[in-house]
Amino acid sequence: MKKALKPVSFLLVLICLLMVTSYLVTPKGYENVYDIQLVNRKINAVSQEKENTLDVLFTGDSEASNTFSPFQYWKEQGIASYNLGGSAQRLNDCYTVLEDVLKHQKPKLLVLEANTLFRKNAVYNQDDSVLMWAEQLFPVLHHHNIYKTINLSVNLLGATKENAYADQCKGYYARVRIRPYRGSDQYMKTNKRDTTLYPETLEYFEKIADLCKENNVELIVVSVPSPKNWSDARHDTIQELCNQYDVTYYDLNKLDNVLALDWTTDTLDRGDHLNMNGSKKVNAYFSEILKEKYHIPDHRGEADYAIWDKQEAELNLY
């Protein structure tokens, strides 16, 4: 009888441990966060910025973080911005980061890169139903890496040199590697990418739109050039969504001739992300839109922004 009870006792103890650790590793307010490590790192990094000095915020997944370079916007237009994007970042995580940042900043504009809208923005892994069930029951199985972010300085959150350098670049990943895209220039017509917008996506898009309205932030949506990810059908899907919320949508995939992108030199990974060559062209074009259409001020020469010139000179990106 005692032998029979041992496995049961062990199982009960294990369940209790999983329940307790699940409670401990899920911080209050983070119940709907997919990647706590990424969200923590972003929140801590942007908190280093002087209060109420950022006029533009960029957010999205890696299409955003590999494209929008705050120091290029600063050097060319004097625009103070920050890139909140991150690798595979889901819309629910974008929302959590934005919500925190708006406690300390009063930006005029939020630029949401649209590729993240096609992600499954659920908190748990939906690719494996058993794993999803287990993660929902015991969140510690999902958030097991959170210990890496506890009691670490901001430059160690995320714990890679590349992440630390991106934090210095105000969220931008300055990647120079070249792997050419050799597919069709007519990718918008030929691509057959899934156009599904999942319920969680629609929920969090509305939450972001509402949060922007509450804080007097104008929301715009942008698709950066990416032969791997974009098509006319996807464009139409995002345009329809933006129309519902009266949000302006810029699809830069439609401006290949204007941007003068060269897909043999301007992509990091065969047409998925832009490298630094490509991002320079996109930012040079888009900074003019921010200046002319949205009247984002030029802060160069102002005492409160002297640190920007110093940081830009130290990085020497442009």
What are the functions of these language-model segments?
Residues 183-263:
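Flexible, glycine-rich surface segments
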Residues 59, 63-143:
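Membrane-embedded segments
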Residues 17-80, 90-100:
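Membrane/wall-proximal cationic-aromatic binding patches
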Residues 236, 245-305:
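C-terminal regions of proteins
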Residues 114, 125-218, 299-318:
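Secreted/periplasmic serine-hydrolase-like ester/acetyl group-modifying domain
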Residues 58, 83-87, 192-198, 222-228, ...:
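Second-shell loop/turn segments in exported
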Residues 1-16:
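N-terminal Sec-pathway targeting helices
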Residues 55-56, 109, 220:
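Structural motif
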